[in-house]
């Protein structure tokens, strides 16, 4: 009798994706982040669903409803903080996943890579709208500042902003629609993630060496299921420590002040995971230029396959490119730090230099380094 998992229409899909999937035998812990992102997404959808049962998307009651969740709902505080810090874990995993893709040349799977970029944009949009929902000071002013960036678009900008706001300022209509979008987008992300996997399984996984692994594959279960479970346990451990010991570590204290359109906070800044992009936006003294730089800071990933000049796929055996990659990581950490600082000397200059370096590394230095490495190896 044939095994049900190989014959049943539904089980067959699960089997070919998570059980009998032929996987390279040498993939490292950097390949764990895909499954961790899946866990983060499920966690966010579940905690978000329970929060939505008690949340009200009205400007007069939104802040109070979040307070009510934390004070009066059974385990409401833990659900709220799991959701808030779960977003931070989500982005840590996302950035490491993208970094892995850059380091090991996974962007040569162009379909998978492009769906990944769309996923990144969608998750960022979802997180931004979620940050507006508690209706604290940073929620309100963050929404005002970021949506206002669209007014930099020539000719249609102002109309576009007012259309998104549903009025002449961020108000009740804005909050209601942001809640609607924040609820629906994670399911869009779920569908896109399925497409992401579909494209990945067309080609099979990349591996640290960057060479084809067709001759050396092992089944996903039990080898990588056990490895993924270890990764998941570590993720849950870090998240639990964060939620139970310092739930507000990554948040902004200003968001505990109810939104007040008449009082601007001294430093408007987004959540920590957007600070690098915010620093790039602020480093350009022109509104439209800043918005373009902001979009390009992520969209630049789409041209990575075109900028790949090396004869090797990954960076495992390319020391010059490795140095540049880690310089890029340091640069992004610098931008993250600058994004949280006030707009004054010396932060302005540091931010501008870090922004220039970011684009320089990706567009100029890495392709040149690859050519140099090819020549050293006489390839």
UniProtKB/Swiss-Prot annotation:
Q: Which terms in the GO cellular component ontology are assigned?
A: mitochondrial inner membrane; respiratory chain complex III
UniProt key word Isomerase: no
What binding details are noted for the cofactor? Binds 2 heme b groups non-covalently.
Chain coiled-coil ranges:
none
Cofactors: heme b
**One Pfam family matching this protein:** Cytochrom_B_C
Q: GO:BP terms for this protein? A: mitochondrial electron transport, ubiquinol to cytochrome c
Location(s), subcellular? Mitochondrion inner membrane
Q: Which GO terms describe its molecular function?
A: metal ion binding; ubiquinol-cytochrome-c reductase activity
Task: List positions binding a ubiquinone.
Answer: 201
Which InterPro entries is this protein grouped with? Cyt_b/b6_C (IPR005798), Cyt_b/b6_C_sf (IPR036150), Cyt_b/b6_N (IPR005797), Cytb/b6-like_sf (IPR027387), Cytochrome_b (IPR030689), Cytochrome_b_C_euk/bac (IPR048260), Cytochrome_b_N_euk/bac (IPR048259), Di-haem_cyt_TM (IPR016174)
TM segment ranges: 33-53, 77-98, 113-133, 178-198, 226-246, 288-308, 320-340, 347-367
Q: What is its main location?
A: mitochondrion
Q: Which UniProt keywords are listed?
A: Electron transport, Heme, Iron, Membrane, Metal-binding, Mitochondrion, Mitochondrion inner membrane, Respiratory chain, Transmembrane, Transmembrane helix, Transport, Ubiquinone
Q: Which domain of life is it from?
A: Eukaryota
Stated family: Belongs to the cytochrome b family.
Q: What else is known?
A: Heme 1 (or BL or b562) is low-potential and absorbs at about 562 nm, and heme 2 (or BH or b566) is high-potential and absorbs at about 566 nm.
Q: How does it assemble?
A: The cytochrome bc1 complex contains 11 subunits: 3 respiratory subunits (MT-CYB, CYC1 and UQCRFS1), 2 core proteins (UQCRC1 and UQCRC2) and 6 low-molecular weight proteins (UQCRH/QCR6, UQCRB/QCR7, UQCRQ/QCR8, UQCR10/QCR9, UQCR11/QCR10 and a cleavage product of UQCRFS1). This cytochrome bc1 complex then forms a dimer.
Q: What does this protein do?
A: Component of the ubiquinol-cytochrome c reductase complex (complex III or cytochrome b-c1 complex) that is part of the mitochondrial respiratory chain. The b-c1 complex mediates electron transfer from ubiquinol to cytochrome c. Contributes to the generation of a proton gradient across the mitochondrial membrane that is then used for ATP synthesis.
This one is known as Cytochrome b
Native organism is Pusa caspica (Caspian seal)
Per the record, the gene is MT-CYB
């Amino acid at each position: 009798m044939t095994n049900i998992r190989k014959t049943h229409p539904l089980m067959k899909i699960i089997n070919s994706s998570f059980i009998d999937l032929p996987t390279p035998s040498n993939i490292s812990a950097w390949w764990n982040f895909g499954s961790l992102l899946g866990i983060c997404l499920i966690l966010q959808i579940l905690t978000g669903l329970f929060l939505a049962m008690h949340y009200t998307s009205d400007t007069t009651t939104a802040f109070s409803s979040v307070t009510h969740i934390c004070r009066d709902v059974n385990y409401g505080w833990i659900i709220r903080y799991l959701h808030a810090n779960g977003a931070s874990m989500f982005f840590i995993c996302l950035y490491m996943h993208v970094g892995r893709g850059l380091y090991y040349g996974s962007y040569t799977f162009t379909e998978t890579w492009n769906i990944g970029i769309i996923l990144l944009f969608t998750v960022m949009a979802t997180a931004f709208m979620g940050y507006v929902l508690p209706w604290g000071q940073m929620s309100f002013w963050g929404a005002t500042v970021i949506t206002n960036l669209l007014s930099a678009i020539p000719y249609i900008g102002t109309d576009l902003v007012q259309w998104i706001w549903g009025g002449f300022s961020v108000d009740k209509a804005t909050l209601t629609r942001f809640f609607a979008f924040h609820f629906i987008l994670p399911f869009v992300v779920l569908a896109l993630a399925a497409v992401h996997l579909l494209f990945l399984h067309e080609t099979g996984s990349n591996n640290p060496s960057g060479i084809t692994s067709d001759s050396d594959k092992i089944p996903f279960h039990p080898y990588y299921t056990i490895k993924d479970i270890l990764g998941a346990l570590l993720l849950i451990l870090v998240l639990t420590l964060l939620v139970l010991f310092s739930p507000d570590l990554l948040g902004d204290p200003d968001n505990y002040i109810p939104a007040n359109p008449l009082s601007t906070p001294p430093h408007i800044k987004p959540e920590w995971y957007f600070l690098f992009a915010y620093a790039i936006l602020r480093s350009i003294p022109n509104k439209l230029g800043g918005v373009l730089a902001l979009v390009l800071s992520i969209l630049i990933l789409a041209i990575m396959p075109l900028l790949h000049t090396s004869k090797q796929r990954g960076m495992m055996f390319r020391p010059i490119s490795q140095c540049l990659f880690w310089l890029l990581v340091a640069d992004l950490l610098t931008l993250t730090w600058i994004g949280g600082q006030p707009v004054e000397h010396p932060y302005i200059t540091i931010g501008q230099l870090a922004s220039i370096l970011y684009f320089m590394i990706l567009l100029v230095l890495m392709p040149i380094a690859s050519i140099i490495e090819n020549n050293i190896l006489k390839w």
